[in-house]
Amino acid sequence: VVSPLLEDYIRNNYPKYKLTSSTCKRITDPKALEEELGRDYHIVVVDYDFNNNWEVLEKLPRKKDCELLVNACCEPNCPRRSAHYRCIGVQQIAYNEHIKKYKNLPFDAAKYDPENFRNCPYSQRGIFDIRGLRTHITPDDIWNKYVPMGFEQFKIEGRTASPLNVLETYMYYMAKPECRDEARFTLLKTLENTGALIFK
């Protein structure tokens, strides 16, 4: 959750529901992050500007309840990220309303993007473009630094990314380097055989 109104509603009406503190809150102050971890959230998604910031990460309580976004495409310290998150929220609400009323008409997200976030150059970055960012967490870092420190939850971004970028990201994070080529081929072949991927 990011909205206090929604959080209060869930806490009052569904007191056993497990709440996640969203990265959309953009908690960038280390003290505020520690305070957030002191509340009764099931998971706190850490702002990825803290990725690889060992001085802050080592001091965090409840590391096992922190979730880290490993492959952020956004520019570190982006001043527009909060506004972009709000825009995405507005678009999601508009989309839900649209499909209730107009099931067979396509949704035009541009109508709900007055700040033109859909053309943000960073949102088009792929797995090969982001590896140089200071916020990027490599598979080796996960196993050799984060897990030994007590972190257990890692999240891969990609809901709105190109399917081919998602595929390559999965290969990077979830397949051993020596198995990636075969895993990639097997997945692509399966997608082709099922009609999910069509080559023209």
Residue ranges and their predicted role:
Residues V1-A32, E36, Y41-K200:
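Active-site pocket-lining/capping segments in soluble small-molecule metabolic enzymes
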